[in-house]
Amino acid sequence: MWIMFSVFGLPIPISATELLLASAVFCLVFWVVRTWRPRVPQGLKSPPEPWGWPCLGHVLTLGKNPHVVLSQLSQRYGDVLQIRIGCTPVLVLSGLDTIRQALVRQGDDFKGRPDLYSFTLVSDGQSMTFNPDSGPVWAARRRLAQNALKSFSTASDPASLSSCYLEEHVSKEAEYLLGKFQELMSGPGRFDPYRYVVVSVANVICAICFGRRYDHDDQEFLSLINLSNEFGEITASGNPADFIPVLRYLPNTALDLFKDLNRRFYVFVQKIVKEHYKTFEKGHIRDITDSLIEHCQDKRLDENANIQLSDEKIINVVMDLFGAGFDTVTTAISWSLLYLVTSPRVQKKIQEELDTVIGRARWPQLSDRPQLPYLEAFILETFRHSSFVPFTIPHSTTRDTNLNGFYIPKGXCVFVNQWQINHDQKLWEDPSEFRPERFLTTDGTVNKVLSEKVIIFGLGKRQCIGEIIARLEVFLFLAILLHQVEFHVTPGVKVDMTPLYGLTMKHARCEHFQVRIRS
């Protein structure tokens, strides 16, 4: 006996035996998936889980915007729910209070990283950011990286008139951008700002890490930094290849580019580190790389830990710092420029504030930040509304624990939905509306309580180590640019602000930007 099925409009004959066998396999797999759960201690319960397909789980449900889909599911199932990608269970956290409870108050329980395939490709599996290690070695290296980053960014430079290294580097790059934008207006009359912002932001972190900047036409440098989209696509939460092993062996252009990018970036940094070793002088520390070499030669990270820093680990730490200070800042500035040209009223108000506080005789400085609350409110609203980091890098539990009465076993993969927090109607009035004024109090100052509810850099022990620098850098770039020029797009051009999902969500490139010099 044969039964006719239609697939993509084509009739396919299937025997009754084959149908019976397929049904039996389907039922068996479904039973295994549903029953393969850890034993839940008395008094606790398992997180609720929507229905999903056997073997596939919720891959098809997540679609192209998993942050939005999971936010919708949280409204039905609560702040703690479980999905499956393939057959792998994944805990999804939503809600500001729940996420703070997990990452801050129970930070030791949730500070791990899952051992995902894509993570093993970053720095040959030795990345401080993506490596599953969360023990004392990881903690010591993180402290070392934070101290080195602070020493060559927010610390003062005795040889400069700027307040700190970061201010000096950003001011130089902002000056270059202004000159470039004017040059482009004299030529083609329009431009894509991302093409130039990405290099200037990369040059700031290069100056901090390597003590040098690169020309905007350096092809090797451009080929690396312009592949950040591919990096974000692969390392984003929910990449099926991390959970369904067979997908790693199927043709995957993005995955191939990701592997190539990591290999080339490692070689790029390795070459710079070798050059630093050749010219290293103890007592004359030029940048972060020199600082790490000095620690390496001292053969310890701190006085209480017998942990050595190998030459290879220097490369990995520098790569992590580059990532922490590059892609997030570039994306933040890029989104900011889009909001400025689509909200001319907001842009004008920022420039009026800049003129009132700073005047026209000098450029903005980091010390001006407390006196520019509307610009700060604009940056906060850009972070919130775009939520361009929709999820943190996935976490994992380091031991059996419970959250909100739900049992969470050790080693569980955890997605933290930052987008949901930033668009939660319980926290924000009209969350879909772009309105910087929401962050200002009646006396015109920044509402500190509300500003702390915007989550974009993670929380707790895995919080982005470059957060403080990133916030300062975004502020100073925007302050200088808006002080000097007015941004707009070619008349009649409609700006596409549709987010493109990834570790950091980009937008479609716009080649119709224009600037007008402010008098």
Curated annotation (Swiss-Prot):
Binding site for substrate: 231
Enzyme Commission code: 1.14.14.1, 4.2.1.152
Location of region: Mitochondrial targeting signal: 36-47
PROSITE patterns: CYTOCHROME_P450
Any one GO MF annotation of this record: steroid 17-alpha-monooxygenase activity
Inducing factors: By oxygen; in lung.
Subcellular localization, as worded in the UniProt entry: Endoplasmic reticulum membrane; Mitochondrion inner membrane; Microsome membrane; Cytoplasm
Glycosylation-annotated residues: 74
Cofactor(s), names only, from the UniProt record: heme
A Pfam family annotated for this UniProt entry: p450
Record-linked SUPFAM superfamilies: Cytochrome P450
Gene Ontology CC: one annotated term: endoplasmic reticulum membrane
Keywords recorded for this protein, A-Z: Cytoplasm, Endoplasmic reticulum, Glycoprotein, Heme, Iron, Lipid biosynthesis, Lipid metabolism, Lyase, Membrane, Metal-binding, Microsome, Mitochondrion, Mitochondrion inner membrane, Monooxygenase, Oxidoreductase, Steroid biosynthesis
Catalysed reactions listed for this entry: an organic molecule + reduced [NADPH--hemoprotein reductase] + O2 = an alcohol + oxidized [NADPH--hemoprotein reductase] + H2O + H(+); estrone + reduced [NADPH--hemoprotein reductase] + O2 = 2-hydroxyestrone + oxidized [NADPH--hemoprotein reductase] + H2O + H(+); estrone + reduced [NADPH--hemoprotein reductase] + O2 = 4-hydroxyestrone + oxidized [NADPH--hemoprotein reductase] + H2O + H(+); estrone + reduced [NADPH--hemoprotein reductase] + O2 = 6alpha-hydroxyestrone + oxidized [NADPH--hemoprotein reductase] + H2O + H(+)
Additional facts recorded: Increased expression of this enzyme in lung due to oxygen exposure has been related to hyperoxic injury in microvascular endothelium.
Function: A cytochrome P450 monooxygenase involved in the metabolism of various endogenous substrates, including fatty acids, steroid hormones and vitamins. Mechanistically, uses molecular oxygen inserting one oxygen atom into a substrate, and reducing the second into a water molecule, with two electrons provided by NADPH via cytochrome P450 reductase (CPR; NADPH-ferrihemoprotein reductase). Catalyzes the hydroxylation of carbon-hydrogen bonds.
Subunit and interaction comment: Interacts with cytosolic chaperones HSP70 and HSP90; this interaction is required for initial targeting to mitochondria. Interacts (via mitochondrial targeting signal) with TOMM40 (via N-terminus); this interaction is required for translocation across the mitochondrial outer membrane.
Name of the protein described by the UniProt record: Cytochrome P450 1A1
Organism whose genome encodes this protein: Ovis aries (Sheep)
